Amino acid sequence: EFFKTFNALIDQNKQLVISADRSPSDLDGVEERIKSRLGWGLVADINETTFELRLGILQAKVEQMNMYVPKDVLEFLARNIKSNIRELEGALNKVTHTSLIGRSMTVESASETLIDLLRSNHRSVTIEEIQKKVAEFFNIKVADMQSNRRLRSLARPRQIAMYFAKKFTQKSLPDIGRNFGGRDHT
């Protein structure tokens, strides 16, 4: 059904925007013909937003809400909430809500209000960084660790890197497995 809809829209010179956490060729459970069609278009890797963009979004949101939030509080939010825009706006809503219950809006009160969110937003390590460090330590290539080759010399480094990936990232076991030769460790 999606395939037919996709083709019908393309035939009508319509544009589609499809979002995923990986490239079309890496999508599991998607037919090859759909992967192929998705590959026709522009595939863009969207990276973390800049401080200036996050601050601009916050300022626009405050203006839209017709509220006053001190500049240092907005800068604090923009500097510390980097994960995604929904979380950034949610943090702004929490901070502005505290002012509605009579607390002053300061960096300190914002920090107290958002303590759990701020704790979870500290930079986390990526699977790629883990693979690089483990490969460097064992003097092997990252590509070998990512391959499906079952050499004894690769097994231990791969196991260690997968253990670290599970321990230090929020990735699921299937996601981790995909980064290590397509293994399914569910």
Swiss-Prot record:
Q: Give the span(s) annotated as Domain II.
A: 1
* Region span, Domain III, AAA+ region: 1-99
Record localization: Cytoplasm
User: Would you kindly state one Gene Ontology biological process term found in this protein's UniProt entry?
Assistant: regulation of DNA replication
Q: What is any one of the record's Gene Ontology cellular component terms?
A: cytoplasm
Q: Which Pfam families match?
A: Bac_DnaA, Bac_DnaA_C
Assigned keywords, A-Z? ATP-binding, Cytoplasm, DNA replication, DNA-binding, Lipid-binding, Nucleotide-binding
> Where are the residues of the annotated region Domain IV, binds dsDNA?
100-186
Molecular-function GO term, any one: ATP binding
Judging by the UniProt lineage, the source's domain of life is Bacteria
Residue numbers spanned by region Domain I, interacts with DnaA modulators: 1
Its subunit composition reads:
Oligomerizes as a right-handed, spiral filament on DNA at oriC.
Q: What does this protein do?
A: Plays an essential role in the initiation and regulation of chromosomal replication. ATP-DnaA binds to the origin of replication (oriC) to initiate formation of the DNA replication initiation complex once per cell cycle. Binds the DnaA box (a 9 base pair repeat at the origin) and separates the double-stranded (ds)DNA. Forms a right-handed helical filament on oriC DNA; dsDNA binds to the exterior of the filament while single-stranded (ss)DNA is stabiized in the filament's interior.
Its UniProt domain note says: Domain I is involved in oligomerization and binding regulators, domain II is flexibile and of varying length in different bacteria, domain III forms the AAA+ region, while domain IV binds dsDNA.
Entry similarity comment? Belongs to the DnaA family.
Q: What is this protein called?
A: Chromosomal replication initiator protein DnaA
Organism field: Wolbachia sp
